[in-house]
């Protein structure tokens, strides 16, 4: 079971203000920050989560990585895909192009002599 650190390294996403705790530093994998006890306002133009770590999107739901795109196959016709955010993973695009070349004689990739 993981222990919760008492140095305040957990992030509260629902608070508008973050309260810094009375410790002098944090010795965690989340980075080292000095805490002095004052209330720090959250700027309205900035996201409330900490986007500085690759794993932040797993907790805060803001994924922009192309391989994290949700792709689902249409049940009506095999080979038709629905993509949720407009990005196509490279492997899926390559497989789709290869299938089109096999089925379409006009897009034959062999060089003409």
Curated annotation (Swiss-Prot):
What this protein is reported to do is described as: Probable regulator of exocrine pancreas development.
Protein name stated in the entry: Pancreatic progenitor cell differentiation and proliferation factor
- Kindly give the Pfam families that the UniProt entry links to this protein: PPDFL (PF15060)
Native organism = Xenopus tropicalis
Q: Which UniProt keywords apply?
A: Developmental protein, Differentiation
- According to the UniProt record, which cysteines are disulfide-bonded? none
Report the superkingdom from the record. Eukaryota
Share an example GO biological-process annotation for this protein. cell differentiation
- Give the family per the record: Belongs to the PPDPF family.
* InterPro entries recorded: PPDPF
